Amino acid sequence: MRDAIPAHCYRRSVAIGVLFLSVAYAMYGVTTYLLYTAQSLWALIAFAVIRGLTIGPTFIVGHDACHDALTPSARWNRVLGQIALLPSWHSFTAWRFRHNFIHHRHTQVLELDDGYPPADEAQFRRMTYLQKLRYRLSRTIPFAGLLYSQEWFESHLLPNAARRQDYKLAGRYFALDYAFVIAWMVCEIALFAGLFSRLGLINESHFHPATMLFFGIIVTQFFWHWEMGFVTFLHHFHPDVAWFRESEAPAAAERQLISTVHVKFPAGFNWGLFNILEHTAHHIAPQIPLYQLANAQAALKDAYPQRVTEEKFSLMTVWKTFAVCKLWDPTAKRWIGYPE
């Protein structure tokens, strides 16, 4: 299947990688400045939301680097990747391990993929009341971020001993990466808590530190988590896309082709998310850089027109996906609703 993608789609450049990181950080930096200097509550709310969404492009650059797709240099990918992942509070080593070696290796495999696999009816019935509530909410548009929040908290912010050992085995720089992330988090909290202004390093914000912490940290992270959960859901959930038991899963390449959805957003949105919406091509060949994904996706569509799942974005199609994709029946191989 990779042979269907032209060779030029695999070309990578340090200069272009640095350019995309610079653009992503420029968007993030401008919204951070506008949030910190906001003079009205409405401006504060608006810039907190926008700042959360601009974490997406920085994360996508880091995601590319974790696949060694951003540039042809492993060293540049590591450095640029960790810088890019800081606003999303992610360690390069931990994300690379969980995303590359679990999600990509086991895409759409119920027992193994950590990309929010759906429960079946029996699993749902065994859940506690709170677990059922969380599951139901996470499959709604407003609370799609819950899908990602639990993964981030348990696997990235406070990984248990077993996960930490996995990360250390996967990369010798895990402790250093994690230290960078914690330092970034502390600095970000200190900024909105007013510590830097008390030290005379910057001007005071217009609002009380508690208000700034709420909007600068909680609201911003809420909308970043929502963006991550929402986009990931659209990539791997669709009324016509199946999930598989491990014993019945197709070969890896076939599974990536038929199970990854290409959501066709308007061009501006696609650019703002650095082409990650061209997701089938990314799963077939993760080493393709984000700046070549559109060409690679078009080539796959030409080669496999009946097997690539495409969905033109609209409020109706998004509503349908969330409405239908609740529980998965692995025997009947279809989506089902919640039990009464």
Predicted regions and their residues:
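Aspartate-rich (DDxxD/NDxxD/DxxxD) Mg2+/diphosphate-binding motifs
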Residues: 61-79, 107-120
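Active-site His/Glu-centered metal-binding helix of metallohydrolases
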Residues: 65-66, 238, 284
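Cytosolic juxtamembrane regulatory segments of multi-pass membrane proteins
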Residues: 249-268, 323
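C-terminal, well-structured subdomains that either form a transmembrane helix-short loop-helix hairpin
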Residues: 271-293
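Transmembrane alpha-helical segments that form the membrane-embedded catalytic/substrate-channel core
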Residues: 52-62, 91-95, 143-155, 217-247, ...
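Active-site-flanking alpha-helical
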Residues: 31, 66, 70-71, 243, ...
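Non-catalytic, topology-defining segments of multipass membrane proteins
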Residues: 1-54, 86-219, 291-340
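Membrane-spanning helices that line or support transport/gating and their immediate boundary helices
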Residues: 61-65, 98-105, 229, 233, ...
